[in-house]
Swiss-Prot record:
Pfam families for the chain: PRAI
Pathway as given in its UniProt record: Amino-acid biosynthesis; L-tryptophan biosynthesis; L-tryptophan from chorismate: step 3/5
Name of protein: N-(5'-phosphoribosyl)anthranilate isomerase
Catalytic activity: N-(5-phospho-beta-D-ribosyl)anthranilate = 1-(2-carboxyphenylamino)-1-deoxy-D-ribulose 5-phosphate
Gene: trpF
Family of this protein: Belongs to the TrpF family.
Gene Ontology molecular function: any one: phosphoribosylanthranilate isomerase activity
Disulfide bonds: none
Length: 215
């Protein structure tokens, strides 16, 4: 289905951005979480976002950001959306949305059915949701760990108040199955299109988008 929208997260170079656009991605992610190998500085992100191919929505990934963090990022980087990938409360999501005037995507980590319970509340304030695999205990990163969760958990949970995106261990080989099982209309990928840690592969990007849109 050509209306499946793909987000490729972890852009680090102009070549990454161009390859994502050429592959047909709708969104690209700029990672501001310093502990991640995919992270970029504000200066790097500003250069990438300012020169981004036309049509790519630029999403800034942050984890439990302070206002000072977001002031610095949004003051320099022309983002189209903020992705909150930490333990931000419903109230904090609403605050950020109001303060910065940008659409906000809230990530919900899922390992079991009970993890889906907060989604209805977040859907009332967030512009979009991302349903991702919950990071393993002790993991250094909140996402981008290349692990998935039981997609059947979403079989009867497809309709929330806000649009949502599926993430977690998706690859060109399994994204079609994930879409069929969950009904997702949007999917996110990072490690699944890398040939080495934090190294995006244009061929894998293209294969991923083609597989997603062929469902």
């Amino acid at each position: 289905m050509a209306d499946i929208r793909v987000k490729i997260c972890g852009m680090k170079t102009r070549a990454d951005m161009e390859a994502a656009a050429a592959a047909g991605a709708a969104y690209v992610g700029l990672n501001f979480y310093a502990k991640s190998a995919r992270s970029v500085t504000i200066a790097q992100a500003a250069a990438l976002a300012s020169d981004a191919p036309v049509g790519l929505a630029k999403v800034g990934l942050v984890v439990n950001p302070t206002d000072a963090d977001l002031d610095a990022i949004t003051g320099s980087v022309p983002l189209d959306m903020i992705q909150l990938h930490g333990q931000e409360s419903v109230e904090r999501v609403a605050e950020i949305k109001t303060r910065y005037g940008l659409p906000v995507m809230k990530v919900i980590g899922v390992a079991e059915a009970a993890d889906l319970d907060p989604i209805d509340l977040y859907a009332q304030v967030a512009d979009q949701l991302m349903v991702d695999a919950k990071a393993p205990k002790g993991a250094k990163l909140p996402g981008g760990n290349g692990i998935s969760f039981d997609w059947q958990l979403l079989a009867s949970k497809k309709y929330w108040q806000a649009p949502w995106m599926l993430a977690g261990g998706l690859t060109p080989e399994n994204v079609a199955e994930a879409i069929r099982k969950t009904g997702a209309r949007q999917v996110d990928v990072a490690s699944g299109v890398e040939s080495a840690p934090a190294q995006k592969d244009p061929d894998l990007m293209r294969a991923f988008v083609e597989a997603a849109q062929a469902v």
